[in-house]
Design a protein with these regions (language model features):
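Acidic, glycine/proline-rich low-complexity segments that act as flexible tails and inter-domain linkers
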Residues: 1-48, 101-119
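Short alpha-helical scaffolding segments that buttress acidic/His motifs in well-ordered protein cores
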Residues: 31-35, 51-58, 86-93
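Residue-level detector of well-ordered alpha-helical segments, enriched
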Residues: 47-51, 82
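C-terminal structural segments of small proteins and small subunits
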Residues: 84-108
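Iron-sulfur (Fe-S) cluster-binding segments and ferredoxin-like electron-carrier domains
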Residues: 68-80, 106
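Short cysteine clusters
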Residues: 62-65
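Charge-rich, acidic-biased intrinsically disordered regions
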Residues: 77-88, 113-119
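Short, conserved micro-motifs enriched in small and acidic residues
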Residues: 46, 56, 60, 96
Length: 119
């Protein structure tokens, strides 16, 4: 998967939130406030929270969540090995279906590495 394909998935999240924000401003505003509050660094670092969110996204089978939280975890300093290990924890907890959702994780890692000139 190319980085442009991942960017399309990420832009779909933004489009959804913008569309819903116009039709359901109270709900999306409340969700955004909750998101900011939870994202604030307290006992867990941003990196740790993003790795948890990634594992939960894999367990839930949410491809958009996988791309978003892979990106955010990398931005927070997570390594490729940490991303894969978080994915394996998801598989441990959610079984075979979660294993199949390591496919988008691996594609996201590859796409972000290509974008940043890593391999």
């Amino acid at each position: 998967m190319e980085y442009d394909d991942v960017k399309v998935k990420l832009s779909e999240i933004e489009e959804l939130l913008n569309t819903l924000g116009k039709k359901h401003p109270k709900e999306i505003s409340a969700f955004s406030r909750f998101l900011r509050e939870v994202a604030e660094t307290k006992a867990l670092t941003t990196r740790e929270k993003e790795l948890i969110a990634l594992a939960l996204g894999i367990s839930a089978g949410c491809e958009w969540c996988i791309y978003l939280h892979t990106q955010k975890a990398l931005e927070a300093g997570a390594t490729k090995e940490e991303l894969i290990e978080a994915g394996l924890v998801a598989v441990l907890m959610a079984g075979g279906p979660a294993l199949m959702h390591l496919i988008p994780l691996m594609k996201a890692i590859e796409a972000f590495e290509k974008e940043h000139g890593e391999s």
